[in-house]
Amino acid sequence: SSSHMRILSIKNFFRKINNNNIVTISVLTPSVFRKNFDLICSPLHDKDKLKDLKNVLFFEGSLAQVSDLEPDNQIGLIGLGGVNKHFIFHENDLIKQIEYILSLYPKKQWYVFTSRRTPEMMIQKINQLKKIYENISISTEGFDEIIKKASIKIITQDSVNMVYESLSCKGKTILFNMKCKKENKVVKQ
């Protein structure tokens, strides 16, 4: 909210100096002074917050860079979120699904990316898998590069941004089977 206030202050400053109309655009829903923006680009799930405004463009999901790069059939990506309020992050169920994936695609090099929400115990379980499967590695860097190269990307449902980033690249996107805690607008997406 302080950044939105700063932007509007800068707009007023330039308006006084140049005597021109400065256009202000907010990408994502501003928390304050919504009526002062000329245009707001907002996720569809914020529609109720902005129902009184006519200067809003809604988008589905999250903003992600689109890639036309042809995927490499030798590369796969596993994206893990973590504990969240929408889905049950059951580590053992996810490990079983990962083992199944590795058995289906034994020749593919798998890159596992975790998030700051991924429990340490889950990371330890992935490290145990590395002792059995040589074609898996936990990656801390290179996500933007690998997601574009991966021919198949398997992602936990709680990682909404990662899902949309994957859908913005060529290759298959598959979601891990996870149970939702309750039906709401996030799990229905």
Please tell me what each predicted stretch does:
Residues 1-59, 64:
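Active-site and donor-binding regions of nucleotide-sugar-utilizing enzymes
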Residues 40-43, 110-116, 174:
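Short internal beta-strands
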Residues 7, 33-34, 47-50, 85-88, ...:
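Short, charged/polar "capping" segments at the starts of alpha-helices
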Residues 167-189:
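Nucleotide-sugar donor-binding patch of glycosyltransferase catalytic domains
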Residues 126-164:
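Donor nucleotide-activated moiety binding/catalytic core segment of transferases
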Residues 61-120:
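Active-site donor-nucleotide binding/catalytic segment of nucleotide-sugar enzymes
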Residues 18-23, 106-108, 170-172:
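A short helix->loop->beta-strand "cap" motif at the edges of active sites that frequently abuts
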